[in-house]
UniProtKB/Swiss-Prot annotation:
Name assigned to this protein: Octanoyltransferase
Binding annotation for substrate: R70, G71, G72, Q73, V74, T75, Y76, H77, S137, L138, G139, G150, L151, A152
InterPro entries, per database record: aa-tRNA-synth_II/BPL/LPL, BPL_LPL_catalytic, Octanoyltransferase, Octanoyltransferase_CS
E.C. designation(s): 2.3.1.181
Pathway assigned to this chain's UniProt record: Protein modification; protein lipoylation via endogenous pathway; protein N(6)-(lipoyl)lysine from octanoyl-[acyl-carrier-protein]: step 1/2
Gene expressing this chain: lipB
One MF annotation (Gene Ontology) recorded for this entry: lipoyl(octanoyl) transferase activity
Major site of localization recorded for this protein: cytoplasm
Catalytic residues (positions): C168
Homology family: Belongs to the LipB family.
Length: 215
């Protein structure tokens, strides 16, 4: 079992600098570099994955669109959504891509269960769902045996921008969020519970909070 998993709490940061930093981290890390997970909220932005098609961007309006190098299609990030970027040496951990996705889904399902919310994964559509509505999205890139990008959990946010796209390429896909199912929630507490679940499902022994920037 690996030892300590490091987390960086980035607060709210624009998407592109974080994306560029995770690319640098992945490109420059050595075979002994510790894994990290970055937790962040983004200002409103649509990100279009490598499989994305222009027709799934219906009416982006004043929200910027960024073409990115993760798998999947278009999604939305905004305030009140908890994003976790998993910067892992998956080769060293011994995870296949499908295994890692399943671990991420189980992490989210157990987090939601801790709030009394029943959620499921779908074998043909990565992510986590409540009664058919999507509450969490997943998208990864593997480079040199290491992962970047990650997951996005809708906690307590404005869901309207999802109606401007076909989320993850699915026309009319309903979106939901934790606040609609669990009443009053604290964002920081959701983040803490996510950290604990990630440590558990990535087979780490413990966690620590990393200091310093990502530049």
């Amino acid at each position: 079992m690996p030892g300590t998993l490091g987390f960086r709490e980035l607060g709210q940061m624009a998407y592109e600098p974080v994306w560029q930093a995770m690319q640098r981290f992945t490109n420059e890390r050595g075979t002994t570099a510790p894994d990290e997970i970055w937790l962040v909220e983004h200002p409103p932005v649509f990100t279009q994955g490598q499989a994305g098609k222009a027709e799934h961007l219906l009416l982006p309006g004043d929200i910027p669109v960024v073409q990115v190098d993760r798998g999947g299609q278009v999604t939305y990030h905004g305030p009140g959504q908890l994003v976790a970027y998993l910067l892992l040496d998956v080769r060293r951990l011994g995870f296949g891509v499908r295994d890692l996705v399943s671990r991420m889904e189980r992490c989210l399902i157990e987090l939601l269960a801790s709030y009394g919310v029943t959620a499921v994964a779908k074998p043909d559509a990565p992510g986590v769902y409540i009664d058919g509505a999507k509450i969490a999205s997943l998208g990864l890139r593997i480079r040199h045996g290491c992962s970047f990008h990650g997951l996005a959990l809708n906690v307590d946010m404005n869901l309207e921008p999802f109606r401007r796209i076909n989320p993850c390429g699915y026309a009319g896909l309903a979106m939901t969020q934790l606040s609609e199912h669990a009443g009053s929630i604290e964002f920081a507490e959701v983040s803490a519970r996510l950290r604990a679940q990630l440590v558990k499902h990535l087979d780490y022994a413990e966690q620590t909070t990393l200091t310093g920037g990502i530049d």
